[in-house]
Amino acid sequence: MQEKWWHNAVVYQVYPKSFMDSNGDGIGDLPGITSKLDYLAKLGITAIWLSPVYDSPMDDNGYDIADYQAIAAIFGTMEDMDQLIAEAKKRDIRIIMDLVVNHTSDEHAWFVEACENPDSPERDYYIWRDEPNDLESIFSGSAWEYDEKSGQYYLHFFSKKQPDHNWENEKLRQKIYEMMNFWIDKGIGGFRMDVIDMIGKIPDEKVVNNGPMLHPYLKEMNQATFGDKDLLTVGETWGATPEIAKLYSDPKGQELSMVFQFEHICLQYQEGQPKWHYQKELNIAKLKEIFNKWQTELGVEDGWNSLFWNNHDLPRIVSIWGNDQEYREKSAKAFAILLHLMRGTPYIYQGEEIGMTNYPFETLDQVEDIESLNYAREALEKGVPLEEIMDSIRVIGRDNARTPMQWDESKNAGFSTGQPWLAVNPNYEEINVQEALANPDSIFYTYQKLVQIRKENNWLIRADFELLDTADKVFAYIRKDGDRRFLVVANLSNEKQNFSVEGKVKSVLIENTVTQEAVEKQVLAPWDAFCVELAD
């Protein structure tokens, strides 16, 4: 395997609407991100994954794109975008754009033309049928919407304002590749590809993910755009297995650099149930099994994985699986240490590095997320008690990740001088960047050290992975690289756990506890975590 820059990279996801507001309108923007690049450089990250900033009516927070080659006015201008790319480059930070090509907004010129003129070439850029089948939207209800002008139904797997593309249309594909090259020419560092596993869909056969033409389309995209350039490309692939991940990310296949797989994240939900039926407790045995599978079955020569706990669609890990009260700092560090020393490219979601938590939502009028509001409406119609609905939204709703970044203890956590578009978490006076930077033992410095370890240690790329047999709530593994052996241990519980180290400790790479004491006593305190190199 040829080593690439992204094998040692750590990517930081910015959700622009909630990161930093430069002009007091309550909405984060591009100049706001640029103003915080020194902070991100201090953390040490290699790249920023930028959630969509394209022109959009914002029905789904920018994932409904009206113009791929224009910036949404709420975020700034194309000049602001160029400046962000240039200023990031000065700090050795690359900008990864969020590529949403499964669908557009219904306000995109292509869709407008498709509706106005059924004989236009653009009509075939979307999927139209005389009669709907029973496919359902991910955002609830039918995936088909009736268009009165033409008397046909169009397909939308997300909101009805997000019509799905017809990837079978070659002209559409060429238009998409031209748009990608527009951004590549601007000097971006790659693409994160939203729900990319859906582009090969065959709606008449109810094939939604992993359709037969998915990989041929990605090979074609690779050749037409980023294939000969040193860019990071990552596909959002909810249904991927290690075998499927190889199809995407094996360098010989010439598709993508890596995938986002969500098998571990699905432990947040009850099996076979909608996401709102969340699991009350983390199944640690299953978590170990899933990570062991991905670490051992997706070999370094066969492909590459992403490592993440959080993103803009998920609840805060420290709240759903950690302990965001007594052990907030320690459990946040434990999850970071456990994940970042595996094979793959780690992703940090904004605020994760300071231990931001879920928001204590009490009423529906505090909620902005379209998915949560659709769920609430349908659940209320079915007679589900409001308190039960609010409990689900508090635990699993997407707005938990989208509350404004907590910069300091001033009004609105320093995010904006105006009224924030979504309320700031009331705990911002205790949990904020200023506080984290002032405390040498904060979560921030654990993340900073993990980023540094990855930059400096190539064994993280190639070392074998061996899961250790331990107490149920202890997750421990060995990374073996030639004669060197590194032991990573995390107690994922509020209780003490027995654990004995086989062999002698040569050195401590990182810890959230006094490792020597834990090793000598053969007992892990709640949420203890560390990585040590073992002596020969």
Please annotate each region the language model reported.
Residues 2-177, 181, 185, 196-253, ...:
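Acidic/aromatic-lined carbohydrate-recognition and catalytic surfaces
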Residues 106-138, 218, 222-404, 409:
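Conserved alpha/beta catalytic core and glycan-binding cleft of carbohydrate-active enzymes
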